[in-house]
Amino acid sequence: MHNLLENLRRRLLAQRTPEPLPPTSQGLARPSHDVVRGPCDADIPPDARNTMPEGITVEEALAVAELPQKHALDILATAQAIRSVHKGGPAALCGIVNAKSGRCPEDCAFCAQSSHHATGSPVHALLDAETLLRRAEELRQSGAERYGIVTSGTRLTVRELDTLCEAAVRIRRETGIALCGSLGQLTPDAAACLKEAGFSSYHHNLETSRSFFPAICSTHAYDDDIATVRAARAAGLRTCSGGIFGMGETDAQRIELSATLRELDVDSIPVNLLSPIPGTPLQHRPTMPPMRALVSIAIYRLMHPARDILVCGGREATLGPWQSWIFLAGANGMMVGNYLTTTGRDMADDLAMLATLGVRA
């Protein structure tokens, strides 16, 4: 093993992760701010967050990224060792519903739902409470702990937000599944409403680094997305924010995004891999080489030893038969079921894979 990797491995393994809060009769402990948590690193007591293990520096991450290809397996092995110590519990699983689809005024180059692109993406208004409840129960029975309600558009209207919060109260009461909102840009007042309705987490991807963002989106500012993550965190919501790999960014820009996520102290990092969609500006972009994608995931684990890292959209197209390697690369969870506008892998196949790996019963 390269000396750099061995030194990083020893340093990260020597650190300790704070013990999670103990279970309660309701299934999970509740911190003093009464946010319902999933089986994730947000179960760490708030006063222990400052003692979370420190990841490698940006300079060290760049050095790892520059190692020759012959060291790729050693990079994965290093990340897997860190995952097994700091995030070695059962794989975290989340699922989503496309609760409002299409006609988005943003021009994100990767997105099928943008009104700027001719993709033939489904278009529908906000789903009713019964449909949202049915999808929640399906995911809960399949083993997902967290249910993401995702809507297209810059942000919800006040009426849509009220409707969704009313549905959330019922979903929490009847299924018990942890709720995550992915509803676009968020004001502090909207974040407070979501928390009161029973949402425990808010998802809002930065998508890419600040330096590469102008090549991906021109209809809103990078700081708008950062403000949303901060508003969610200030409201007591668990924050979930990551990006998409393979849009043409460099290794350094993926590391730049990782550093920004660390500055924001996000709880969970979803990693998506570009699946080029016909009709979008990135439709002809080749998929990322599988090993490069895995090494990039591994670097994120080294930078975030004790945070949740979930691999989500695009894993089928980019990784193919190497999908199970995401755990060898340091991920500790994944999205299951279908995505927003593309079909995911059969749930039974994913659960069988997890059982074979020993990361899920």
UniProtKB/Swiss-Prot annotation:
Protein name, UniProt field: Biotin synthase
Question: Keywords of this protein's UniProt record, alphabetized?
Answer: 2Fe-2S, 4Fe-4S, Biotin biosynthesis, Iron, Iron-sulfur, Metal-binding, S-adenosyl-L-methionine, Transferase
Q: Enumerate the SMART domains for this protein.
A: BATS, Elp3
- Binding residues annotated for [2Fe-2S] cluster, in chain numbering: C180, C240
Task of the protein: Catalyzes the conversion of dethiobiotin (DTB) to biotin by the insertion of a sulfur atom into dethiobiotin via a radical-based mechanism.
Q: Which domain of life is it from?
A: Bacteria
Q: Which GO terms describe its molecular function?
A: 2 iron, 2 sulfur cluster binding; 4 iron, 4 sulfur cluster binding; biotin synthase activity; iron ion binding
